[in-house]
């Protein structure tokens, strides 16, 4: 097995850490269509901050390319491209389809194509395999084979890394399932779980994030109820958390490449086969509306303080979808920006983690370098970056005018230190 060369297709948050680990042990070619990304990696720079320059150096058998010719000799192809949703919240399989076309054009007899992208159950064999067959002229499970091992990367998490998270694996035949499982065992210290088939592995991945999404939706709904009852949500959760089996979820904006996206893949397939998934979609609607709810609460607090909402200066602290990482994918902080904008507010976004060019390109939001003291009518703590945790209450309030509103989404401050929080 170790003599087989791997092509890693897609070098983002998922693909690069995987390529680095395999690249410590065997020949790996990292392929990506983004030339700027490839140039950075060749210079030892990972803009996602998932791997350090030292880790890149340790992957002595790893090389990078945008040239399709360079991966023709590979016999194992691991595809780690994004699987987003479109503006109608439907699965957008374009990156997966395009990458399948790419791999199919260089596919040879005996090759194995392993997908890591999150999809609905059946997508690998219903969508990807026909493309591979069409592009290559080869027959599935006769000339080439497929595997599936869903990614479990948690961006920004330096404790749970690719090697320390148990890996689910599957293959299109029992023999290939074993081969795929043994491949991942080379690098996964936490061990593997060989699923009975590809559909089972696909379903396992998509429900991991659906379960989390539904749980957060429940807590978000409780936060809405407790707000009307004038009860502090965190105090309730701390009290309930003293029972051993109470799950430690917190309310908030639900974004990112997984939790706010994956449920729509499952519900899409459910509707396709004639089942209307009520609870999952109800949870999605609730979570998707939290940005609007926060702006509504901040606006009411401003009105109570006789602060004009129209033309108000608003400071939003944080733009990434989670703390301590530069990942902007599907961040729901943009909902705050848009909602405040609908009231003709002047919104400044401050986030020391983000790439400003990326923020402008993705959301037409240009983050400021530093907040201006004494400028803002309302301050919203949206992301729990360490840089914000290190600020004192006085330092945060210094950004506001004398009569400003301070709203805390992430419980960075105590209840009696802010005007409102989830």
Q: Where in this protein do the model-derived segments appear?
A:
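Structural/interface elements that position substrates and couple domains in central-metabolism enzymes
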Residues: 1-422
């Amino acid at each position: 097995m170790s003599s087989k060369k791997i092509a890693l297709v897609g070098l983002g948050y998922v693909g690069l850490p995987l390529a680095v680990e395999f690249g410590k042990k065997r020949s790996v070619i990292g392929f990506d269509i983004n030339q700027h990304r490839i140039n950075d990696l060749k210079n030892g720079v990972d803009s996602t901050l998932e791997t350090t320059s030292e880790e890149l150096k340790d992957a002595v058998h790893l090389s990078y390319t945008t040239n399709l010719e360079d991966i023709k000799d590979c016999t194992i192809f691991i595809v780690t491209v994004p699987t987003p949703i479109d503006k109608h919240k439907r699965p957008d399989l374009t990156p997966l389809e395009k990458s399948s076309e790419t791999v199919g054009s260089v596919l040879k007899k005996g090759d194995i194509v392993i997908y890591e992208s999150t999809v609905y159950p059946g997508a690998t064999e219903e969508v990807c395999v026909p493309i591979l067959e069409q592009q290559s002229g080869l027959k599935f499970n006769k000339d080439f084979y497929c595997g599936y091992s869903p990614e479990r990367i948690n961006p920004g998490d330096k404790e749970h890394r690719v090697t320390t998270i148990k890996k689910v694996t599957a293959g299109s035949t029992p023999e290939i399932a074993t081969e795929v499982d043994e491949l991942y065992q080379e690098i996964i210290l936490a061990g593997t779980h060989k699923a009975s088939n590809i559909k089972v592995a696909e379903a396992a991945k998509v429900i991991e994030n659906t379960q989390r999404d539904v749980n957060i939706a429940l807590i978000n709904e409780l936060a809405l109820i407790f707000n009307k009852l004038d009860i502090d949500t965190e105090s309730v959760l701390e009290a309930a958390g003293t029972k051993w089996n109470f799950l430690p979820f917190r309310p908030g904006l639900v974004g990112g490449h997984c939790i706010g996206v994956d449920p729509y893949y499952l519900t899409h397939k459910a509707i396709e086969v004639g089942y209307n998934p009520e609870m999952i979609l109800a949870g999605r609607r609730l979570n998707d509306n939290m940005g609007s709810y926060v702006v509504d609460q901040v606006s009411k607090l401003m009105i109570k303080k006789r602060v004009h909402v129209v033309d108000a200066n608003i400071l939003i602290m944080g733009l990434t979808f989670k703390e301590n990482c530069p990942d902007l994918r599907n961040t729901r902080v943009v909902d705050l920006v848009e909602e405040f904008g609908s009231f003709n507010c002047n919104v400044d976004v401050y986030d020391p983690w983000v790439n400003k060019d990326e923020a402008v390109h993705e959301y037409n939001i240009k983050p400021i370098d530093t907040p201006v003291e004494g400028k803002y009518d309302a301050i919203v703590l949206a992301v729990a970056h360490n840089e914000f945790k290190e600020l004192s209450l006085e330092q945060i309030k210094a950004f506001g005018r004398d009569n400003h509103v301070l709203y805390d989404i992430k419980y960075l401050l105590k209840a009696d230190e802010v005007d409102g929080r989830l």
